[in-house]
From Swiss-Prot:
Disulfide bonds: none annotated. SUPFAM superfamilies: Protein kinase-like (PK-like). Belongs to the protein kinase superfamily. Ser/Thr protein kinase family. WNK subfamily. It comes from Oryza sativa subsp. japonica (Rice). It catalyses: L-seryl-[protein] + ATP = O-phospho-L-seryl-[protein] + ADP + H(+); L-threonyl-[protein] + ATP = O-phospho-L-threonyl-[protein] + ADP + H(+). Residues 55-314 form the Protein kinase domain. Residues 1-48 are annotated as: Disordered. Residues 9-19 have a biased composition (Low complexity). This is Probable serine/threonine-protein kinase WNK5. The active site is at 203 (proton acceptor). PROSITE patterns: PROTEIN_KINASE_DOM.
Length: 327
């Protein structure tokens, strides 16, 4: 459940502005901030981090199951960031295990450096408020699901570029030492910068770090995107390939997999019996359909992310010629 939409908490210190420590109309010599010109309104921060580098604005970028994400600003680099804020006390009362999963996400983000995985900047704990804060890279256009809903007419070429970038991020996770299984890959956990088309994987709160056997045992995820073996509690990183196939299906159709099901129970029965989503039958492009079917096949037949990157499906995606449009 997302947190209650209560007004954002003010910092215990005085509200700070982007030009903190600099008088209006003056420039800090050798500093990191420049004031707005006289007569311009400055946007106030709701709070700043302990170092004074990062500021949080009031507007919310997104609500997750365990956190609220605000628009933030890095005064040192002059870039916008995502300020992730989690109320640990309320979270611990509702689900103590979630606290550890959140800490796991932070630890993972700190160890991962890849152009197609959301970047991490800083983390700190506000003990008085019982809030964990962490600063991450922000993607200007939100999740891939939101972006696809806003832009209904997208070329197959563009879709392939997005799909390939997701695979590059997955390959980095799966070849990480130790291997990392995302376990909750879906289009709401993939983010995009619309002005560049760059795609990044985020929300690693349910990810699992596994040993050399590459086997995990916990049932977690989003039902519409969960591989059947996830329900058996014994699985490998190939569950991410299944979820990836469902992501591609959603990108193509703009429809959640198994939208025809009325409940999680119905989804479970369809998935475990090998019944594909109804949306798959509506894909007319045989190449697209075959690619998705390859991803959501039996675990032993699913290719790795590295193998999929070599699939003919991605041949020529950097060519200038468009290859058709999805409406």
């Amino acid at each position: 459940m997302p947190p209650n939409p209560t007004p954002p908490r003010r910092a215990t210190t005085t509200t700070t502005r982007a030009t903190s420590g600099v008088r209006r109309g003056e420039e800090e010599q050798g500093g990191m901030a420049v004031s707005a010109s006289a007569g311009e309104e400055e946007e106030a921060f709701e709070e700043v981090d302990p170092t004074g580098r990062f500021g949080r604005y009031a507007d919310v970028l997104g609500l997750g199951s365990v956190k609220k994400v605000y628009r933030g600003f890095d005064q040192e680099e002059g870039i916008e960031v995502a300020w992730n804020r989690v109320r640990l006390r309320a979270l611990a009362d509702r689900d103590p295990a979630m606290v550890e999963r959140l800490h796991a996400e932070v630890r993972l983000l700190r160890s991962l450096h890849h152009e197609h995985i959301i970047g991490f900047h800083k983390v700190w704990l506000d003990r008085d408020a019982g809030v964990l804060n962490f600063i991450t890279e922000v993607c200007t256009s939100g999740s891939l699901r939101e972006y696809r809903d806003r832009h209904r007419h997208v070329s197959v070429k563009a879709l392939k570029k997005w799909a390939r970038q997701i695979l590059l991020g997955l390959d980095h996770l799966h070849t990480h030492d130790p291997c990392i299984i995302h376990r909750d890959l879906n289009c709401s956990n993939v983010f995009i910068n619309g002005n560049t088309g760059q795609v990044k994987i985020g929300d690693l709160g349910l990810a699992a770090i596994v040993d050399k056997t590459h086997v995990a045992h916990t049932i977690l995820g989003t039902p519409e995107f969960m591989a059947p073996e996830l329900y058996t509690e014994t699985y490998t990183e190939s569950v991410d390939i299944y979820s990836y196939g469902m992501c591609v299906l959603e990108m193509v159709t703009r429809e959640m997999p198994y939208a025809e099901c009325d409940s999680v129970v119905q989804i479970y029965h369809s998935v475990t019996r090998g019944v594909p989503p109804a949306a798959l039958k509506r894909i007319r492009d045989p190449e697209l359909r075959a690619f998705i079917e390859r991803c959501i096949g039996q675990p032993r037949n699913r290719p790795s992310a590295a193998e999929l990157l070599r699939d003919p499906f991605f041949a020529g995606i950097d060519d200038d010629d468009s290859t058709g449009t999805l409406g």
